[in-house]
């Protein structure tokens, strides 16, 4: 009987002005080890009793739905889920489960995983291609969904830039983070963001790292979401003072992303100190860019 292991990277989306558009895969991974089984048995590492209930486990729900979409009956699975991507921090933890389950279901059914099949299943659980695609394909992508069609493209990302991700102890759900956003954006703010996301992509392409600070400014979401994150401005400023090239929320938060080409430890420590001033514990991770995406192995 085959045992399959899929390793799926965390993602960080938006990167400042690229709201619901840009996504980047990081070298932090959740792993899912699956084998056929009569009924569902789930083991989690670290132990998470909530996720060991099949109805609460997103990976199981997705693989069950994927089977149904192919006209198959889901009889069960034995799953070991190794969680390293923190939940509700803006690092795409749900996307890892969705992508992992789709990749495994495609392998089990010996079906080619086309874009149409992938998005048909994935959008049942998450509507954000800027998270889903880098978790699946890896690298740096820009994406949009137009009616029933998804368009995306990969963008070169400099190899000398790392992501310093500062992760506070508190969770921030995507639903709550979206609830504080305005329904309408002034024209001047739309122009502001279009200018900056264009500058951001050009600065990366031409290695003009001196432009990244202004290019990662935003008026679409961060001015509203930062109110949910104590001492946000101080954490960001500490990152810049320590040598960060650009700093922004990671996805919807609560994690904060700093792009840097040096001083990685200093940046991480300075930003965690910013949270400490508000009485909030946090940790930082220094991550490279994952360029492979979801990786499937047959263990036996």
UniProtKB/Swiss-Prot annotation:
GO terms for biological process: threonine biosynthetic process. Disulfide bonds: none annotated. GO terms for cellular component: cytoplasm. GO terms for molecular function: ATP binding; homoserine kinase activity. It holds the Pfam family GHMP_kinases_C. Its main location: cytoplasm. It is found in: Cytoplasm. ATP binds at residues 86-96. Keywords: Amino-acid biosynthesis, ATP-binding, Cytoplasm, Kinase, Nucleotide-binding, Threonine biosynthesis, Transferase. Its EC number is 2.7.1.39. It catalyses: L-homoserine + ATP = O-phospho-L-homoserine + ADP + H(+). Pathway: Amino-acid biosynthesis; L-threonine biosynthesis; L-threonine from L-aspartate: step 4/5. The keyword Protein biosynthesis does not apply. It comes from the Bacteria. Belongs to the GHMP kinase family. Homoserine kinase subfamily. Catalyzes the ATP-dependent phosphorylation of L-homoserine to L-homoserine phosphate. HAMAP family: Homoser_kinase. This is Homoserine kinase. The lineage of its organism: Bacteria, Pseudomonadati, Aquificota, Aquificia, Aquificales.
